[in-house]
Design a protein with these regions (language model features):
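ABC transporter nucleotide-binding domains
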Residues: 1-130
Length: 130
């Protein structure tokens, strides 16, 4: 992984077993061999038609789903152990497509972004958040 990359995903695969009968199943390839890198300061948007795997990529990237195969790197470190995942989740988040279920209109943007920072005690003083 390049040190310049904040996030790097290599050959990510996420397959789900779909029951095709009482005792049979077949794999559904929801994400198949996806690779990308995000440098510090960059923004990435996942765009595609409904059902193409955008949400699955996001959930797998956050380890909400265990990847079938592939590697996820964050700040030069491969995310693989339970401790890695816990530390990684403190520093990452997913914003879902529906802003009404993702963002509370009664909260300021600062409060929305600051809430997880408060929960994880990621700053000593509120002024550090800005």
């Amino acid at each position: 992984m390049s040190v310049e990359n904040l996030v790097e995903v290599k050959n990510l695969k996420e397959y789900f077993n779909i029951n095709t009968g009482v005792f049979t199943s077949k794999p559904l390839k929801a994400v198949d061999d996806v690779s990308f890198a995000i440098r510090k300061g960059e923004t990435l948007g996942l765009v595609g038609e409904s059902g193409c795997g955008k949400t699955t990529v996001g959930r797998t990237l956050l380890h909400l789903y265990k990847p079938t195969a592939g590697e996820i790197w964050f700040q030069g470190k491969k995310i693989e152990t339970k401790q890695d995942i816990l530390e990684y989740r403190k520093k990452t988040a997913m914003v879902f497509q529906d802003p009404y279920s993702s963002l509370n209109p009664r909260m300021t943007v600062s409060d929305i972004i600051g809430e997880p920072l408060d929960v994880h005690k990621m700053y000593a003083d509120k002024s550090e958040m800005v």
